Swiss-Prot record:
Biased composition (Polar residues): 273-282
GO cellular component, one term: plasma membrane
Keywords, ordered alphabetically: Cell junction, Cell membrane, Membrane, Tight junction, Transmembrane, Transmembrane helix
Gene that produces this protein: CLDN23
Stretches assigned to the Extracellular side: 25-81, 132-160
Protein's job: Plays a major role in tight junction-specific obliteration of the intercellular space, through calcium-independent cell-adhesion activity.
Keyword RNA-binding: no
UniProt-recorded name of the protein: Claudin-23
Keyword set includes Cell membrane: yes
Cytoplasmic side: 1-3, 103-110, 182-292
Topological relation to the membrane, as annotated: Multi-pass membrane protein
One BP annotation, GO: cell adhesion
Protein's organism: Homo sapiens
Classification via PANTHER family: CLAUDIN
Length: 292
């Protein structure tokens, strides 16, 4: 059996989301701070969840900077740490379940396990999207996320973008894998419809079972009683007339008997006065009326 499309799509999107979330969690690039007083114009400070890095003209990058404003103690940073780590752990668990559920090395996948992995991956995407959105909401609030006063400016950095992308990919991949529940639910519904009832109802009226003799059915009815249009066997078929081969031969016309003697001679009006055969002998070879 070929791997369903929803499973293949989920198995592609989920690892990509895991990689992006892992990079966004570890990289010090959630917020970009620049425009410091009494420092070169090109000095920039990248703040992350675990570290700060100072960069100047893209040539020198120094990490492990001292937190002078209490940035790491801010509530959005602490919550983001916990939720991002939880999201990564849930993603790993979901991928493990998906690998066991899809089972590309076997013919039939495990739809229940694949659907469960989709639910876990979807939850992992939510756990990654919540801290990223919350951090972005308070990005410019210096009371919540401490930062130097103006003219210092704060901007969104690349780690937030990676977090958004990774979380969205996990949501899509988890939803795609969760669609694997559809064949399993369909099969269960079919089993319930085809399953036997709880038990036969007991009738209050006593019934009498009468066995009627089965009538002898004709051979044609026996073969057509199942509702299928099947031809009867050869012994019950009527023999078809054989086609005539050739052409009819001409037959001679029947010959009729002809007599050259006029049998009506002497029966006309002219012969009424003539003497009959009884008075004088008949010259004709035919018998006379008196002889009849």
């Amino acid at each position: 059996m070929r791997t369903p499309v929803v499973m293949t799509l989920g198995m592609v999107l989920a690892p990509c989301g895991l990689l992006l979330n892992l990079t966004g969690t570890l990289a010090p690039g959630w917020r970009l701070v620049k425009g410091f007083l009494n420092q070169p114009v090109d000095v920039e400070l990248y703040q992350g969840l675990w570290d700060m890095c100072r960069e100047q003209s893209s040539r020198e990058r120094e990490c492990g900077q001292t937190d002078q404003w209490g940035y790491f103690e801010a509530q959005p940073v602490l919550v983001a740490r916990a939720l991002m780590v939880t999201s990564l752990a849930a993603t790993v668990l979901g991928l493990l379940l998906a690998s066991l559920g899809v089972r590309c090395w076997q013919d039939e996948p495990n739809f229940v396990l694949a659907g469960l992995s989709g639910v876990v991956l979807f939850v992992a995407g939510l756990l990654g999207l919540i801290p990223v959105s919350w951090y972005n909401h308070f990005l410019g609030d210096r009371d919540v996320l401490p930062a130097p006063a103006s003219p210092v400016t704060v901007q969104v950095s690349y780690s937030l973008v990676l977090g958004y992308l990774g979380s969205c990919l996990l949501l899509l991949g988890g939803f795609s894998l969760a669609l694997s529940f559809a064949p399993w639910c369909d099969e269960r519904c079919r089993r319930r419809r085809k399953g036997p009832s709880a038990g036969p109802r007991r009738s209050s009226v006593s019934t009498i079972q009468v066995e009627w003799p089965e009538p002898d059915l004709a051979p044609a009815i026996k073969y057509y009683s199942d509702g299928q249009h099947r031809p009867p066997p050869a012994q019950h078929r009527k023999p078809k007339p054989k086609p005539k081969v050739g052409f009819p031969m001409p037959r001679p016309r029947p010959k009729a008997y002809t007599n050259s003697v006029d049998v009506l001679d002497g029966e006309g009006w002219e012969s009424q006065d003539a003497p009959s055969c009884s008075t004088h002998p008949c010259d004709s070879s035919l018998p006379c009326d008196s002889d009849l």
